[in-house]
């Protein structure tokens, strides 16, 4: 996954912790149907990516995409659809595969509910401070 570190369960459990000031946290609830198993796992589809290396690949098209990714997204994750301003989808996928194989781009899988049911997800990032909390993902 993109995020790592502390996990906040829905209920208190052994190992629960207190939020510390000036640390950033991502609150990322998942909602499933009532028929779900109650957990998610990585699926096969990958539509979120992040730059892993700026090292040139010696492939002109791949290097052009690397430059575009760096200029537009830097080290932040990006969606395939954001590349479609410059490339057709089939071409973007082909070039991304080259970058993934050369370990220049990392692909993140879509999360799937344990028994294949639908999953909805939202996210806010927040930073506790002495006055409460700052939510950095507010519009």
Regions found by a protein language model. Give the residues of each.
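Active-site neighborhoods and metal-handling regions in enzymes and metal-associated proteins
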Residues: 1-139
């Amino acid at each position: 996954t993109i995020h790592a570190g502390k996990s906040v369960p829905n209920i208190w459990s052994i190992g629960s912790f207190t939020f510390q000031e000036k640390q950033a946290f991502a609150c990322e609830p998942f909602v499933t149907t009532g028929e779900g198993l109650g957990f998610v796992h990585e699926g096969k589809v990958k539509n979120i990516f992040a730059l892993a290396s700026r090292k040139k690949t010696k492939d002109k098209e791949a290097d052009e995409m690397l430059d575009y990714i760096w200029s537009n997204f830097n080290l932040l994750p990006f969606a395939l659809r954001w590349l479609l301003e410059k490339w057709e989808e089939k071409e973007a996928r082909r070039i991304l595969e080259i970058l993934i194989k050369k370990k220049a781009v990392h692909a993140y899988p879509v999360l799937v509910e344990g028994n294949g049911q639908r999953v909805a997800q939202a996210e806010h990032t927040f930073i506790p401070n002495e006055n409460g909390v700052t939510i950095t993902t507010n519009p």
